[in-house]
């Protein structure tokens, strides 16, 4: 029989663990909710307001001219993005309902791989026309800079998916009875 001091410490420890679990679960739900909100905002903006991705020029008479930076190839990439955003929203809703470590990690790995596919397709299709920028140097440099940035994003996402996968495997190996 543990002494009263040890029993109190064990009970206090148990409460702290429960508090921590509740906070982290609440934090994950907040994260899932923020992700859902962000994905819906992106879905709406990039589907219905893409024409505002443009170079704006103020004319001498005060009017504003909007020159689109997107080519018609944007509409070849848009279904890929919309599909990924819808999958992400659905996955985050599912994770709010069912929140287990192994499930969460698998879903996050899948979503990250989908992100790599979306970014890789964006680089491949490259639906941008930077010729509307009035600076010749910027017109030459911007496509290169955007391509490099997108490749770095894709590689970063790929590394993130790999790290999550390794952590998941290590966690599962530690949990399996030997």
Where are these regions (language model features)?
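Alpha-helical membrane-embedded segments
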Residues: 147-164
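Loop-to-transmembrane helix junctions at the membrane interface
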Residues: 88-119
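Canonical alpha-helical transmembrane segments of integral membrane proteins
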Residues: 34-50, 86, 115-118
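Short, membrane-exposed interhelical loops at transmembrane-helix boundaries
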Residues: 132-147
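Membrane-helix interface motif
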Residues: 44-63, 120-133
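N-terminal juxtamembrane cytosolic/stromal segments of multi-pass membrane proteins
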Residues: 1-37
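Transmembrane alpha-helix entry/boundary detector in multi-pass membrane proteins
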Residues: 59-82
